[in-house]
Amino acid sequence: MCRAAWALAAALLCACAWADAPCRIAYDLGSSGIRAGSTAVDTVVQADIDYLGPLLAGRGLEETVAPTRAALRELAERGGFPAHCQRVGGGFSAWRLALERDSATLADILARIAAESGVAVLAIPQGIEGAYSHLAARRALGSRFRTSHVLDIGGGSLQIAGERSAWGALLGQKAWQRELCRALRVTDALPCALQPMTREELATARALAAALLGEAGKALPETVSLTAISRPVTRGILPAVARLEGDGAVREGLARSSLATAIDRLAGMTPQEMARLVGGPERFAPYLLSDMLLVEGVLIATGGQTLQVAETDLTNLPGLLADDHAFAWGRRHACYLARLRREGLDAYFGDPADCSE
């Protein structure tokens, strides 16, 4: 993200006291569902909708429109949010992918959603989402957040977010494994049978991670420290490495060398052999090795030797609720959609006051 855009992100989120702010409702539309919150009520409510799956399968977002409209209406009622509040939604990784593929189709979908739900949904740029993530991590972790950046691995996207710099890509848990499945198994199936890997396949996987994550090191400061907050790390990688090392110690961090050793040990095993060795929740097993390779790649790209780990249920809601610019676009949504068709993600950075549409 360029410096000017990041300066805008910082300015947008610098004032987050809502006591005197107008009533707002925000909707965080992620890869696998919607979360909703309001400045008027502490409640956060959610609905599960798979946005990433249809996109990765090449079907687009059309099949998600009806459940999205219904969820946007139902969530406000379930959360007890005041009816007079302004409503804005932020579309993140899956929505950015849809925009990249066909901006006109996405703009039409957003127009229909707004007309039938009263919610103005915007496609939020990666860097702005980074600002949201950093703000949410500071609020959620408090004194436990002692690093310069937060590492947030979702299903679709990966974020490395700091106060003044951020980087992200469509390399979340499922999207990254899809890259591996294509490269090593020539399939789009998710999850795919990555194990056992040969030494040559493991080298290919690491080279792929280096290629896809290499831009992170260029976009971020020379010195970066990371706190991982997502369940693929907190409930998958961290306990697996602890079991492999067998010392029973409670860990709040992870050494890159320990992660590399774990990868080398597990890659050649069958999934069943790995499960017997490391245990852990069954739902994490199909992605454990690919998650490890992803995090190792992040540490290499950012020059990190250690990773702090502190689980929190991070959402984009605090940042979106504080984003005056997004809510200004919500009031000029037709103009925003016209610009979205022409300018793509850059439409967000325009000035709503300049609208003539």
Spell out what each predicted region is.
Residues M1-W6:
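Bacterial N-terminal signal peptides that target proteins for export
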Residues C14-W18:
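N-terminal signal peptide c-region/cleavage motif recognized by signal peptidases
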Residues D20-T43, A137, L141-L170:
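Gly/Thr-rich phosphate-binding beta-strand-loop-beta motif of the actin/hexokinase/Hsp70
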Residues S31, I49-L52:
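N-terminal extension/subdomain marker
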Residues V41, A76-C85, A115-E116:
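Signal peptide-proximal N-terminal region
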Residues L55-R73, W95-T147, G162-E357:
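Helical "lid/coupling" subdomains associated with nucleotide-phosphate turnover
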